[in-house]
UniProtKB/Swiss-Prot annotation:
InterPro entries: SNAP-25_dom, SNAP-25_N_SNARE_chord, T_SNARE_dom. Residues 19-81, 140-202 form the t-SNARE coiled-coil homology domain. The gene is SNAP25. Its main location: cytoplasm. Residues 1-75 are annotated as: Interaction with CENPF. CDD domains: SNARE_SNAP25C, SNARE_SNAP25N. GO terms for biological process: synaptic vesicle fusion to presynaptic active zone membrane; synaptic vesicle priming. Pfam families: SNAP-25. This is Synaptosomal-associated protein 25. One of its GO terms (cellular component) is perinuclear region of cytoplasm. Part of the SNARE core complex containing SNAP25, VAMP2 and STX1A; this complex binds CPLX1. Found in a complex containing SYT1, SV2B and syntaxin-1. Found in a ternary complex with STX1A and VAMP8. Interacts with HSC70 and with SYT9, forming a complex with DNAJC5. The interaction with SYT9 is inhibited in presence of calcium. Isoform 1 and isoform 2 interact with BLOC1S6. Interacts with CENPF. Interacts with EQTN. Interacts with HGS. Interacts with KCNB1 (via N-terminus); reduces the voltage-dependent potassium channel KCNB1 activity in pancreatic beta cells. Interacts with OTOF.
Length: 206
């Protein structure tokens, strides 16, 4: 009889311990799920900010392209005026053949870069998960929730990986665009400075 009582006590203790571990494991999966959801939200906010930054860079580069077009027109007018005044003060062709100009604008004189960087689109592969994530002991609702939580965690982690790839691709694209903008800005500044010098000479000669 005493042995039966001891065995019952041991079984009850094992059951109590199993329940305790199940409760702790359930809380652990809940915390994991909360953390990855917070990370997902942070990732989404970062992607939105990168997208907004990309739109701003597009507007800036369009502005550089418009300045390039305007300068072409101004240089043409300056050349015509110089011919009318009997002067030869427009080194426009020399400028356009310079390495800096070609680097900024390529061979397309309208300011559209010939080789635009292509965005890399990462294919989203959906992985089918067979079976559960945990080894069942109590086989109750807690383990069902644990399994569901871990499945969600796994899915969100996969999404976070793709987000990280998207961020890396977008940052690379924007870095290349910033380099182009800097080159175009330098080219535009040089042209404006030279246009001012030509205008000063023409006014002085008048």
């Amino acid at each position: 009889m005493a042995e039966d009582a001891d065995m019952r006590n041991e079984l009850e203790e094992m059951q109590r311990r199993a329940d305790q571990l199940a409760d702790e494991s359930l809380e652990s999966t809940r915390r994991m799920l909360q953390l990855v959801e917070e990370s997902k939200d942070a990732g989404i906010r970062t992607l939105v900010m990168l997208d907004e930054q990309g739109e701003q860079l597009e507007r800036i580069e369009e502005g550089m392209d418009q300045i390039n077009k305007d300068m072409k027109e101004a240089e043409k007018n300056s050349t015509d005026l110089g011919k009318f005044c009997g002067l030869c003060v427009c080194p426009c062709n020399k400028l356009k053949s310079s390495d800096a100009y070609k680097k900024a604008w390529g061979n397309n004189q309208d300011g559209v870069v010939a080789s635009q960087p292509a965005r890399v689109v990462d294919e989203r592969e959906q992985m089918a998960i067979s079976g559960g994530f945990i080894r069942r002991v109590t086989n109750d609702a807690r383990e069902n929730e644990m399994d569901e939580n871990l499945e969600q965690v796994s899915g969100i982690i996969g999404n976070l990986r793709h987000m990280a790839l998207d961020m890396g691709n977008e940052i690379d694209t924007q870095n290349r665009q910033i380099d182009r903008i800097m080159e175009k800005a330098d080219s535009n500044k040089t042209r404006i400075d030279e246009a001012n010098q030509r205008a000063t000479k023409m006014l002085g000669s008048g």
